Amino acid sequence: MKILEKDLRKGYLKILPEDQDDLWALYNIIKPLDRVTATTSRDIKHGETSSSRRIPMTLTIEVKTLEFQPFTERLRIRGIVVEGPERYGVKGHYHTLNIEPGKPLIIWKEKWSENELEIISRFTSRKQKVLLATFDYDEAAIALLTEQGIRLLEEFTSNIPGKREPVLFQKGLEKYLSSIAEKILDYINKFQVDIVVIASPGDLQKRVARIIKEKKPVNIITDTVSIGGQSGIRELLRRDSVREAVKETNIIKAQRILDEFHKNLSKNPDMVAYGIDDVEYAVKYNAVDKLLVSEELLRIYDEEVRRRVSSILNEAYKRRAEIIIVPHNSDVGLEVEGLGGIVALLRYPLKKPLNN
């Protein structure tokens, strides 16, 4: 995303979202009672007739609800119009702003938290785009690694004849590998991918990598997995070589933190905290080093819980903790939600209070 204008004394940022990940970031930043200004259109009736036409206009709404479906290119923000053209009489009425990549908006807040500004800062730097492909002799899957998690682009079967017919088997295999390479090339161009990670049992992945490199110079990492398809994608994400290559991606960082959390939970439980009460206590004593919070917890309807979570994040940020918001639809997000929506790795052992 790009920051087009910024005046924190007046409480606003004008932002240009550039892709789906930016919309997801805005979904986690904009809160009820914030105000959002954007160009939109609205049905306006003419006189006493029942006919109406859609009129373009710029409106400011006080936010009530937000809706964002992962891997879509639209963020819907619903609220009450507080500023708009007087001649259309829209003030006080509900309206929904549809925010898309390439469409600027202004966000107004009573006060921007340091954590919210950190999220903005992180998403204004260029994000690494990583394509993942896993396959075996039976099936293949291609996915895009994003800040929202794993976006499955395509899954297909090989249709290779059995090995009892060696000639047909080899022809079928070559056709299958070429097809995988062509699909990967198409997605490289479509998403302007920086890194491609290809994995399979044996060394089939190297053959696909050679086909791709003959047609396009691109950074390719090859590795092995025991199976293709979506299961292979999940296995691939746990490989150290892949984690090292894409370590700046938040979902990979989050998985690494969660793995360390589980390890400490069983062996050294005083080095972790989970659930609002325990994490709040750990933040109070400056013990939190890394923190994962589910996006669902940020948007919980209980206003008191939402206030506590916001306070935890702001205090943790001030005390230089690393904070990552994890998407609900990801494996990491579901695990974190099962642990109370928030987990932390600690800087030093901390005994929990008895009444906690």
Curated annotation (Swiss-Prot):
InterPro entries: eFR1_2_sf, eRF1_1_Pelota, eRF1_2, eRF1_3, Pelota/DOM34_N, Pelota_arc, Ribosomal_eL30-like_sf, Transl-rel_pelota. Its EC number is 3.1.-.-. Its cofactor is a divalent metal cation. The keyword Zinc does not apply. One of its GO terms (molecular function) is metal ion binding. It is found in: Cytoplasm. Belongs to the eukaryotic release factor 1 family. Pelota subfamily. Monomer. May function in recognizing stalled ribosomes, interact with stem-loop structures in stalled mRNA molecules, and effect endonucleolytic cleavage of the mRNA. May play a role in the release non-functional ribosomes and degradation of damaged mRNAs. Has endoribonuclease activity. The N-terminal domain has the RNA-binding Sm fold. It harbors the endoribonuclease activity. This is Protein pelota homolog. It comes from Staphylothermus marinus (strain ATCC 43588 / DSM 3639 / JCM 9404 / F1). The gene is pelA.
